[in-house]
Structures are given as structure tokens and as C-alpha cells.
A protein has these predicted regions:
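N-terminal Rossmann-like FAD-binding beta1-loop-alpha1 element of flavoenzymes
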Residues: 3-27
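Gly/Ser/Thr-rich beta-alpha loop segments that engage phosphate groups in nucleotides
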Residues: 11-16, 44-46, 162-163
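A short beta-to-alpha transition loop/helix N-cap that caps and shapes the active-site region
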Residues: 34-38
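Glycine-rich active-site loop/strand segments that organize a redox cofactor
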Residues: 43-93
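An accessory alpha-helical subdomain
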Residues: 73-85, 93-117
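Predominantly flavin-linked oxidoreductase catalytic cores and closely associated redox partners
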Residues: 104-105, 109-174
Length: 174
């Protein structure tokens, strides 16, 4: 299978990236469902952004990274997206925004965005033999239906950290 972008990790960053990447996109995750950490975040209500998010609050070896990233996509942009999907929310302490009903609404929104963009989602799937090639990347995806080779022009590693092992977080790509 030849694609434009392979994304490893179907958490918030991976799904948002997949929905916006354009072209033929495949996203893979080892979990049974996408967005597992989203589902439990904020006590099950998802603290999805902060109204006071600003570049000066981030530490990085590249001090301009947060400034550039937040100029391209602000907390207001995400709030607008949440509103467009009819997700009700409220503000808690210090500008923290939470879903009124459930974090599952954010997961559903991200899945809808990916589906609308034609993204292929592969769950319970591992990426093996990942190699950088002259034209991009090659790998083997191994999942419930066996193994298949894949080539991609672009690769995004959005595997998150190893913060909650009982939720399936591993040190893969950490």
C-alpha cells in the first residue's frame, strides 16, 4: 500500500494531524480504541484547552516553536471547532475548559473529522521494520488481519509518553 502520510499514534495529536494532513493518510495505534487517554482526561470530562494558553508559558530548546505553533492554531480555533460539533463545555479554574457531558464527545469529534478526511484507522496494529528510504518511509503494519507492507512519503510519530501504563501507554518511540 502506498500512501502520503503514515501516523503512528491515535491520541489527540495523531487524530488531529490525520484529520488535517490531506492526501491519503493511514493512522495506526496498538490500542483497541483511539483516544484512550482523552477518554479519561479531566476526570472523564476532558480538559481540552486553556483560555490563557500563551507562548511564554512553554519551555523549549527552540523558544520560537510555541510562538509559531500557537500563532497557527490557537485555543480559540479549537473552541470554535468544539462549538461547530455541538459539544457543550464550561470553564473551570484558571481558564481550563471541560466538556459538560463526556470526554467521549471529543474522541467522537476527532473520529468524525478523520472519517470526513478519508483517513484509514488501523487499531490493535503495530508498526514493524520502519525504514527511511529515498522517497519517504517503508514499514510493515501487523494487526488482527495479518501483516502488510506500506510505503509513505511522510511519517508522523505521535505516540505520546509513557504516563499511564495501565491505559496502554508504552515507551515506544519515547
Amino acid at each position: 500500500m502506498q500512501i502520503d502520510t503514515l501516523i503512528i499514534g491515535a491520541g489527540a495529536a495523531g487524530m488531529m494531524c490525520a484529520a488535517n494532513a490531506g492526501g491519503r493518510v493511514v493512522i495506526v495505534d496498538h490500542a483497541k480504541a483511539p483516544g484512550e487517554k482523552i477518554r479519561i482526561s479531566g476526570g472523564g470530562r476532558c480538559n481540552f484547552t486553556n483560555m490563557h494558553c500563551a507562548p511564554h508559558a512553554f519551555l523549549s530548546q527552540n523558544p520560537h516553536f510555541a510562538k509559531s505553533a500557537l500563532a497557527r492554531y490557537t485555543q480559540w480555533d479549537f473552541v470554535e471547532l468544539v462549538d461547530q460539533h455541538g459539544i457543550k463545555w464550561h470553564e473551570k479554574t484558571l481558564g481550563q475548559l471541560f466538556c459538560d457531558v463526556s470526554a467521549k464527545e471529543i474522541v467522537a469529534m476527532l473520529r468524525t473529522l478523520m472519517q470526513d478526511a478519508g483517513v484509514e484507522l488501523h487499531l490493535q496494529t503495530s508498526v514493524e521494520n520502519l525504514i527511511k528510504t529515498e522517497s519517504g518511509y517503508s514499514a510493515v503494519l501487523t494487526g488482527p488481519n495479518g501483516s502488510k507492507p506500506i510505503t509513505a512519503k511522510n511519517l508522523v510519530v505521535a505516540t505520546g509518553g509513557k504516563s499511564i501504563p495501565k491505559m496502554g501507554a508504552t515507551g515506544f518511540a519515547y
